[in-house]
Amino acid sequence: MNAVLKSAIAALLVLLSVQAEAGALDQFKSFVSSTHAAKGEFIQRQVKVTNGETKLSNQASGTFLFARPGKFIWLYQKPYDQLLQADGEKLYMYDKDLNQVTTKLLGSALSSSPAAILFGSNDLETNFSLKEAGAKDGMDWLQATPKDKDSTFTLISIGMQNGLPREMDLRDTFGKTTIILLQNVEKNPALKADQFKFVIPAGADVFNPQ
């Protein structure tokens, strides 16, 4: 799984209106406990530091839909078509240009990943250490540190605004940071019974690495 896809299994959100003075941690816990599904749009960028200068690069964008626990559709629309979809048991990664599908069991891999914050169960503090991180850029921030030392990510920063997650900054074990902006988030939309069922595209090559 390439770096872009790893970062992508990282983000989606939910909402609940809370008091304006509530801290990021209270806002986020209320958001998580009150929302069983959500949809919206995302913009994803990577942070690069060259000669001491910080730049944002590799912009990608698309839409997302999720339902707890472990079901989601994360669709890249620009600059290319790629799909990450999970049905609660398996994760499907579809590259439209290659007409190629890679499948993996969700298993325990979800528990300490950024995806667990958005798509997993409500028991966040089992897998993450959470703490307030102050205010910046008009948002209240919290930090989530995975308790699993084998996690791909070392720190996840979440920006909350008016009871909604608006930004996730993901720092991986190589020191690289991916920023995901969340827009037009809608809480608890109506879902079809087979909303997250993945259908293998005609003629697609299917890989099942273990």
Language-model features, listed with the residues they occupy:
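Short beta-strands and strand-coil junctions in structured, solvent-facing domains, enriched
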Residues: 49, 80-82, 100, 150-153
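Sec/Tat signal peptide C-region and signal peptidase I cleavage site
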Residues: 18-22
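Bacterial N-terminal signal peptides that target proteins for export
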Residues: 1-9
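Gly/Pro-enriched, hydrophobic low-complexity segments
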Residues: 102, 126-131, 135-210
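N-terminal mature ectodomain segment of secretory-pathway/periplasmic proteins
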Residues: 23, 27, 33-88
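Anionic-ligand binding region
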Residues: 115-120, 127-131
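Acidic/charged, solvent-exposed loop-and-adjacent secondary-structure segments enriched in E/D, K/R, S/T
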Residues: 93-119
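A mature extracytoplasmic/lumenal domain signature
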Residues: 44-46, 68-70, 76-80, 87-90, ...
